[in-house]
Regions:
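Glycine-rich, acidic and aromatic/proline-enriched surface loops and short helix-turn segments
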Residues: 1, 237-241, 368
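Transmembrane beta-strand segments that form the barrel wall of outer-membrane beta-barrel proteins
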Residues: 1, 245-254, 408
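Short, solvent-exposed loop/turn segments at secondary-structure boundaries
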Residues: 2-4, 257-261, 423
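Transmembrane beta-barrel architecture of outer membranes
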Residues: 5-11, 230, 264-268
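Residues on the lipid-exposed face of transmembrane beta-strands in outer-membrane beta-barrel proteins
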Residues: 12-16, 105-111, 163-167, 182, ...
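Surface-exposed loop/interface segments of Gram-negative outer-membrane beta-barrel transport/assembly proteins
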Residues: 15-102, 122-229, 256-257, 277-345, ...
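C-terminal transmembrane beta-barrel domains of outer membrane proteins
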Residues: 245, 296-297, 363
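Glycine-rich, aromatic-lined ligand/substrate-binding cores of catalytic
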Residues: 498-533
């Protein structure tokens, strides 16, 4: 409620050619973007997220009953429970707003030496200034009924200066033609930020950072400065218009790495062979129904650096509960000798067209290996750090991509184009750290549920607790219930799923009739697992359909056994559906 977003764009562009034979050309563009936002929705499973509280609201309650009034005679929010937030109250008493002014400027100057050789210089700048404000009025349970005030400022700019010399000439030597380019780029990026928050206002609803105790004031300053200098180039050779060899290179020098490892080089090579053109020029030509045939193969490497200030451990300034200045170290141990990441890929494929381009197929196979990845591996807490930045890992992805396209119908006024895309990717963690098979690296998650990269496994495995079961004997495999007849979670985590889908499938159709076009896409992701925290919370709150099968909530007897002095006995205790689903959704991730 009350959300509003307005955006204003202004663009000015000018271009011209001049000089002898119009060999000089200039192009300049300036763009201004102003964005104003009010009451952006708060996301996540948090008490001040109105949508989160609505999801967990009993269906027997009409939310419109809380639209007016939203505050009682004591100034406190009116809501159906002690937790969560009334969305109508949030609109007026937990507002937020932000504004951004962004400027994009770029210009180029180009000179043509000949009809096949030219040079160009470019300059570009991207800068924006953002201001934000958030207010929380007194009476909300999300801040112990205290009011809160916060502001934020951010400044960002990135400048790029580049040059490029390029040339292209057919029949350079006999039937050989070629092209080349050589250039460079200077990139500089800088950002600053200031976040202020007064967690508890002394005078309620008087929104000032000075209205409160210093111990409740939080100030966070950020400063990031990074540069990357680059040289790059391309070289292409073609023979008679049907055989093509292309190569590229790039070398970056990043300020985020130390002097010894600051430079990193990555090349690529590709070869393509247009078989149909070759046959047409040196032979009798392709059959009439066989329109086009092309084969291709490529090798490429890509290097990546990291964010600034991750080489040396420094101390950050803060304060203790009494307001005294303190200095503390971060939780990550840095290594000044880390290098850039390296991603190596191989690809091969073919493209075929039939019946004057009415039917076509494109097939590709690829393999990529990401090595020397910049990772934060866990450390023993006795070291004083939680993790350490290292180069490690070898993650391999292999897959295929197939595209079928056809024009089944074509008349003077109507045509139908259809395209079917299929892709399949298989990932494997070849290695995380040398000599540590089976090592787990956390990618994200919450408490009992984690997404891991596991050495020897697939990327993005889902690990979590499972139901406790009897491991041997007469009742082997049955649920091991607690004394109340409810399921129990294992103490350790197990692999319970994989994020990776079995394959992706997409179908696009385009219909053209005279000057009208209609197009639609059907896209599908088949296989793969997800864990839904939304469903878990709905079950815990009794909102999910499964918590009242057939619209009834009758007690159930969970199938399983209970441990007793003589071993196990079959469970005969009945429990309410409320207790059952709360047991399943225990903690933050449930069983």
């Amino acid at each position: 409620p009350g959300a509003n977003l307005s955006r204003t764009n202004l663009t000015l562009r000018a271009s011209s050619t001049f000089g002898k034979d119009d060999r000089w050309s200039i192009d300049a563009k300036v763009q201004y973007i102003n964005t104003l936002a009010e009451n952006r929705p708060i996301s996540g499973a948090r008490g001040n997220n109105a949508f989160y509280t609505i999801f967990n609201m009993p269906t027997t309650i009409d939310i419109r009953d809380f639209s007016s009034p939203v505050k009682d005679e004591f100034g406190e929010m009116i809501w159906w429970s002690k937790g969560g937030i009334n969305p109508y109250w949030s609109k007026d008493y937990n507002p937020n707003k932000d504004s951004r002014n962004r400027f994009l400027m770029n210009g180029s100057l180009k000179y043509k030496f000949t009809d096949w050789l030219d040079a160009e210089i470019k300059a570009g700048s991207d800068m924006y200034f953002t201001e934000g404000e958030e207010k929380l009025y007194a009476g909300s349970p999300t801040n112990n009924k205290n009011s809160r005030y916060s502001t934020s400022e951010k400044k960002f700019f990135e400048n790029n200066f580049s040059f490029l010399i390029s040339g292209h000439k057919d029949e350079l030597f006999g039937k050989f033609g070629g092209n080349f380019s050589f250039g460079g780029n200077l990139m500089e990026r800088k950002s600053t930020g200031l976040d202020n928050a007064m967690g508890k206002l002394t005078a309620p609803d008087l929104f000032s950072l000075a209205n409160g105790d210093k111990k409740d004031l939080s100030i966070t300053e950020t400063y990031i400065h990074k540069k990357i200098n680059s040289l790059y180039g391309t070289l292409g050779i073609n023979y008679n218009g049907w055989a093509f060899l292309d190569a590229t290179f790039r070398n970056d020098w990043s300020s985020a790495l130390n002097k010894e490892n600051r430079s990193f080089f990555y090349p690529s090579v590709s070869l393509s062979w247009v078989i149909s053109d070759m046959v047409g020029k040196v032979g009798k030509g392709m059959p009439e129904w066989f329109t086009y045939a092309k084969a291709r193969a490529s090798f490429a490497q890509v290097g990546n650096d990291m964010d600034a200030y991750q080489l040396y451990n420094t101390y950050s300034i803060g304060s203790d509960p009494n307001g005294n200045t303190t200095a503390g170290q971060g939780k990550t141990k840095y290594d000044a000798d880390v290098r850039s990441e390296l991603i190596t890929s191989w690809e091969a494929g073919a493209e075929l067209k039939f019946f004057n381009n009415r039917l076509g197929v494109d097939f590709a196979w690829y393999k990529t290996n990401a090595k020397r990845q910049l990772m934060n591996i866990p450390l023993n807490n006795l070291s004083g750090y939680d993790n350490m930045k290292v180069n490690a890992g070898n993650i391999q992805n292999t897959g295929i991509e197939i595209m079928l396209n056809a024009r089944p119908i074509e008349t003077a006024q109507f045509s139908w184009d259809t395209q079917l895309n299929f892709s399949q990717n298989k990932s494997k963690i070849i290695e995380l750290l040398p000599g540590k098979p089976g090592m787990q690296y956390a990618l994200g998650g919450s408490d009992a549920l984690q997404v891991y990269a596991v050495a020897g496994g697939a990327y993005g495995e889902i690990w979590g607790t499972k139901y406790q079961r009897v491991e041997e004997g007469e009742f082997k495999g049955q649920l091991l219930l607690n004394e109340s007849g409810l399921p129990q979670a294992t103490s350790d985590k197990h692999k319970i799923g994989e994020q990776q889908p079995d394959f992706l499938l997409g179908w696009t159709n385009t219909f053209n009739y005279k000057n009208f076009t209609l197009s639609f896409l059907i896209d599908g992701r088949f296989g793969g697992d997800i864990f839904s925290f939304t469903n878990m919370n709905l079950q815990r709150s009794g909102i999910a359909e499964c918590t009242a099968p057939g619209g009834k909530r009758e007690d159930i007897v969970v199938a399983g056994v209970i441990k007793d002095g003589n071993g196990y006995k079959v469970n005969d205790q009945s429990v309410s559906l409320e207790r059952y689903y709360k047991a399943l959704a225990t903690g933050r991730a449930g069983i």
